[in-house]
Amino acid sequence: MEVVKSPMQELQQAKEPFDTMSPLLLKSLVEEPKKRTEVPNHLLESRVYAKLLNNKVIQARPGIVHFGGYEIESKHQQILNIANISDEDTHLHILPPQTKYFQINFEKKEHRLIPGLSLTVTITFSPDEWRYYYDCIRIHCKGDDTLLVPIHAYPVLNNLDFPTFINLSDVFLGESKSYVIPLQCSCPVDFEFHITLLRSHQAFTIEPKSGIIPANGKAKVTVKFTPIQYGMAQIKIQLWISQFNSQPYECVFTGTCYPNMALPLEEFKRLNTRSKKVNVPLEKTTYVQFYPAPAKAKPQKLKEIDYQDLRFPADLSNPFAVATVLNQEPGKLKIKELKQVLDQGDEISKTRQMKEAIFEQKVRQDILTEIENHLKWQVHLGKEHTTYRFKRELTEEWKKARAKYKQNRGDPVEGEELQRLQTEQSQKRIVRDLKGKRQEFHPNFDPLVNNVWLTRHRAQRRFQQAARKIMLERRLLSMLGAIRGMDKESILRKIIQVNGKLIQGENPSRGRRAHLKQEDNIWRYSLESEEVLHFAFPTDSESYNELALDGLGLVPIKSPEIQIKHSYPYFTLKVPQLYKIKGYHPFSVNKSSTNYRLQKLARPLKHGAEDEVTTIITIPKKDTTPLSAKPSILSMKPPEGLAMSVEYDPLYIFNPSPGLFAVKHPLTYAETLIDYHLCSHPKYKYTQESHMGSSIPLTQRQFLHHTDIIPGIMNWKKFQPLVFSSMSDPSMVEATQRSDWYSSVMLPIDVPAPLEDLPEEDRLETTERDLCDQGIEVMLTPEMVQVEFPMLIHRDSKKEKDFKDSTQLPEKVGERVQEEMKNLRSKALNTYLILD
């Protein structure tokens, strides 16, 4: 009976011939599929994504995504929120990362993003090796607003336990105590570290201050405390690790060393026996010389080896150093060195290699700018023309470089060669240009170099200041001597005599003046010894009675429960009424309505018979004043306010409420008045310059609108009083008080006699003023008008002949006067000064 084979066995037998076939033959029979080219993204190629964190429309939270620390062949996720911070709805186009290690996932519920809401994006990171990863998410909004969200992934130290405070206490003087800080790495990547001291101390030593933490290994940092004196010492260190987006670790070490700390009994006895004094003769004492221990030589730091523009570290035993050498390119600077070169301002001190790096960076920047412009499909307008300032700076830079090149080459400097006083030998060949003109040097002789007039003038000025200071000091000393030599008894005696005369009823001023004339002594007061009382201090009463009213002292009294209400009187507020103060009378409105009459009549009044009215012609009276032979055109009258006093406001003398309003003094000869040109007191700086055809000066407004300040008018505040300058220390000297306020030093002895009547000059002036107030008119004279209007002096010869003619008629004289008035008004600057 045959055994039926199972289907699995049949499949296994069928696969056997295929397994025995060569794989190369199978690959040759199968055609490889063609890789399709990726479709270019229009938003990725036509937009520039440079803004971080946020733009005008959206905001990324967080702005930069970090994957700090990861595990290979595992997935890590982080959340990114994109919020709408604008006032309108917006549409978003999120471009995913370009590498396969980062993937994004988000759920877009609506087609637009409402203001205030956010879109949640999940970022998944899948690493395959230990290295640094970088990518970004690009977001395009409505319009041309873009946003860039960078993504960083990097290995970190996971098991780093760095303390923040360590206390090394109770350390003996001369001994040491150490503390070891382990730096452990859990990933197969080397990390560099270095330690900086924020606060240092001599008693602490740290080894090593820099090094490498090996991959999946451990490095130790030892902090040793060796006190050199009693007290407390403290340092603060900072640990930096060469990993991306790392923060420094800080730690504070404190060490103490106190005297007389607890010692063992045997050590205490040993120190006690050594401290006992032993009486040994001086000649038997031995001199022991203590040599200091040789200082430990610090190991020299191995320098890097430069070979064919490559730098090889001295220690190549770790993979970090090997990777550093393999990643180098000949002639390429590091990022740190390139930043230092770009930060320097003076390009003369840079080497040729640094200048080439800067030039290559500028070319690279121009290429990137052209690429961005090509993506924008815009016409490149080119650069601006070279400015004059840039040309001048470039020329000065070339001159400096040429001067430095000549200095390094050893060329002689012309200015220094002309000032050289001795001959110098040079081994260098000097080449001169025969075509150029030789500069001739002509010496100059100055005979006024040795003139000592300025020094002599300065010494004389200082001598004058010193002499003035000595004179003031001597004058002050004489005044102080006179004050100290006052006779106080005579002063008091004269005071008593004057008081006695006042009691008798005499005139104090006449009696005092007569008394001063009789006696030669200058003091006017006196005091007798009987009137001086002794000093008395308050003393307690000897007889103290306990039963007296005040024997028990203050006795507390219970306050009454009755509440007393205080009445506050209120006074009526009285406001000053101006119409009563100025003398105005009240006006009745009712009477004005009944007594008011219109200026124009409603209808014309009736007249009598016009035919019966006889016309009466009145002959005008002729003026009986005889006319002079020479006609006068000076018929103007001065204004009436010239001889009148200024009118004051009634509130100017007594103002009951000055806080409400203030009445100022009226301006005399204000500029708004017509008689301002007759001002007798100028309010401005007078100069000889004036207008053409007038005597009014040009500077009449400088006083009213001046902004300058008289220099030196407040210099007296800078000087110290003479009394304080003569003393050594004004704060330590007691201030003296004046004993006599009416001494002859301050007040004169001979005073003028009292006046019984006005002096003769004042009396004549008052009489003249009274005459002016009576209404006497002041007439202008031809001399006054000639001074004010100098153009009237120059007259035509023809007009002079007409004035000399005495046969003119009165009508022609009036016409001449009117013509002269018109001519005068046309030539004057202020036409309103000439009256009709």
UniProtKB/Swiss-Prot annotation:
It is found in: Cytoplasm, Cytoskeleton, Cilium axoneme; Cytoplasm; Cytoplasm, Cytoskeleton. One of its GO terms (biological process) is cerebrospinal fluid circulation. The keyword Disulfide bond does not apply. InterPro entries: CFAP221, HYDIN_VesB_CFA65-like_Ig, Ig-like_fold. GO terms for molecular function: calmodulin binding. Keywords: Calmodulin-binding, Cell projection, Cilium, Cilium biogenesis/degradation, Cytoplasm, Cytoskeleton. Disruption phenotype: Mice lacking Pcdp1 have several phenotypes associated with primary ciliary diskinesia, including hydrocephalus, male infertility and respiratory abnormalities. Hydrocephalus is observed on the B6 background but not on the 129 background. Male infertility is observed on both backgrounds and is due to an absence of mature spermatozoa in the seminiferous tubules. Pfam families: HYDIN_VesB_CFA65-like_Ig, Ig_CFAP65_4th. Residues 466-500 are annotated as: Interaction with calmodulin. Expressed in testis, specifically in developing spermatocytes and spermatids but not in immature spermatogonia. Expressed in the ciliated respiratory epithelial cells lining the sinuses, trachea and bronchi (at protein level). GO terms for cellular component: 9+2 motile cilium; axoneme; cytoplasm; extracellular region; glial cell projection; manchette; sperm flagellum. Interacts with calmodulin; calcium-dependent. May play a role in cilium morphogenesis. Belongs to the PCDP1 family. This is Cilia- and flagella-associated protein 221. It comes from Mus musculus (Mouse). The lineage of its organism: Eukaryota, Metazoa, Chordata, Craniata, Vertebrata.
